Swiss-Prot record:
HAMAP family reported for this sequence: Adenylate_kinase_Adk
Domain of life: Bacteria
Name used for this protein in its record: Adenylate kinase
A GO cellular component annotation in the UniProt record: cytoplasm
Subunit structure: Monomer.
Function: Catalyzes the reversible transfer of the terminal phosphate group between ATP and AMP. Plays an important role in cellular energy homeostasis and in adenine nucleotide metabolism.
Keyword vocabulary terms for this entry: ATP-binding, Cytoplasm, Kinase, Nucleotide biosynthesis, Nucleotide-binding, Transferase
Length: 215
C-alpha cells in the first residue's frame, strides 16, 4: 500500500494520515523528517543536505528523490508507505515516476477554501495550558476567556485569516496542479488510483470514506 496524501493546509490530512498508517501498518514519510534524519546520520547524502541547509538553500529534487529511494528500502516500508507533503510540485511527481517509485493510491482530501478559513481562523488558544477552542464549533463559556482560569484566549499568528488565505493560495498554485497530473496519469495508465474524498462531516465519516477508497 503506497499512498500519496494531498490536501490544503487545514483539510485534515494529519488526522487521516494517522488512521491510514495504523490501519495498514505503514510508516508516514515526511520530507522534513527524512532530511533531518539524513543530516543526523551523517551519510554522504546527509552531508550534502547539511551543506545546502546551512547555506539557507533549498534542497534539490534530485537529492530528495535519492533520499526517498534509500528510505523506502528500509524494513518498515515492506508493506508500503504514506508520503506526507511530497511531492509538492509537478517536477517532483515526474521525478518520482522516472525513478521507478510506484504509487498505488493518490488520495486528495478536498475541502472548500471558505470552510478551511472558518475552521482555522475560528481557533482560539489558552497559551498557558494549550487548551484550544473554536468560536463556532467549540466556543468557551465566556467569549474570549478560558473556561478553567478565565484568562484571555489568543489567536495564533498562523491561524489569522490573511495567513490562512496566503497558505491556501500557495497550495493552489503549487500543489493543486498535482491533482490534474495524477488524475491524467490514473486515466492513462490505470495506476496510481486517484480518489478525491470530501473532507467534510465527522472525522469518523471521512476516515470511513478514505479507508473504503483504499480497500
Amino acid at each position: 500500500m503506497r499512498v500519496i496524501l494531498l490536501g490544503a493546509p487545514g483539510a485534515g490530512k494529519g488526522t487521516q494520515a494517522r488512521f491510514i498508517t495504523e490501519k495498514f501498518g505503514i510508516p508516514q514519510i515526511s520530507t522534513g523528517d527524512m532530511l533531518r534524519a539524513a543530516v543526523k546520520a551523517g551519510s554522504p547524502l546527509g552531508q550534502q543536505v547539511k551543506g545546502v541547509m546551512d547555506s539557507g538553500g533549498l534542497v534539490s529534487d534530485d537529492i530528495i528523490i535519492a533520499l526517498i529511494k534509500e528510505r523506502i528500502t528500509e524494513a518498515d516500508c515492506a508493506k508500503g508507505f504514506l508520503f506526507d507533503g511530497f511531492p509538492r510540485t509537478i517536477p517532483q511527481a515526474e521525478a518520482l515516476k522516472d525513478a521507478g517509485v510506484t504509487i498505488d493510491h493518490v488520495v486528495e482530501i478536498a475541502v472548500d477554501d471558505e470552510e478551511i478559513v472558518s475552521r482555522i481562523a475560528g481557533r482560539r488558544v489558552h497559551p498557558a495550558s494549550g487548551r484550544v477552542y473554536h468560536t463556532e464549533h467549540n466556543p468557551p463559556k465566556v467569549a474570549g476567556k478560558d473556561d478553567v482560569t478565565g484568562e484571555e484566549l489568543i489567536q495564533r499568528e498562523d491561524d489569522k485569516e490573511e495567513t490562512v488565505r496566503h497558505r491556501l493560495s500557495v497550495y493552489h498554485s503549487q500543489t493543486k496542479p498535482l491533482v490534474d497530473f495524477y488524475q491524467k496519469l490514473s486515466a492513462a495508465e490505470g495506476t496510481p488510483k486517484y480518489h478525491s474524498i470530501a473532507g467534510v462531516g465527522s472525522v469518523e465519516q471521512i476516515t470511513a470514506k478514505v479507508l473504503s477508497a483504499l480497500s
